[in-house]
Amino acid sequence: DKLISDAKKFSDTAVVVFSRNGGEGGDLPMDMASYTGGDAGKHYLELQSCEQEMLSMVEKNFKHVIVLVNSSNAMELGFLEDKNVDAALWIGGPGSTGCVAVGEVLCGAVNPSGRLVDTYAYDLTTAPAYYNAGNFTYTSNGEDTSEHYVEYAEGIYVGYRYYETRYVDNETGKCD
């Protein structure tokens, strides 16, 4: 309570940062049940209950709420439609230099005015690639190795390529 009280004395604006790490070598968790703070049945790229509760607490205590999405992975961002979230900015993986630029955006010195080049789905479970994800390791002589791989059964139709192709097929009637 003291921390919130002190922060409110400093500003009526709160900045909330959501981050997700991931990269080469393995897929992201499809069920967060075994992770601290994770929810059974929720995957890594959606908000967990503890994160949603934290966002709600901030919204109740501050007049303005800004959300920063610090992730190179396309998270489910439907929570940004919350009427109490005043602004959102995708900052990717900013590193030390990028954080200076984030500060310039937040104080109004720079207008980011860009557009995302990635497709962000409301529900990642609607994409076929979601069901081919897993924590797979190669085997050698019948033994598991520590080398991971990802199965791309969709070929090149992963991410934006799937959404663009699906949209065109729907619009032209090719998927019937």
Predicted regions and their residues:
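C-terminal non-catalytic regions of proteins with extracellular/luminal or membrane-system context
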Residues: 1-176
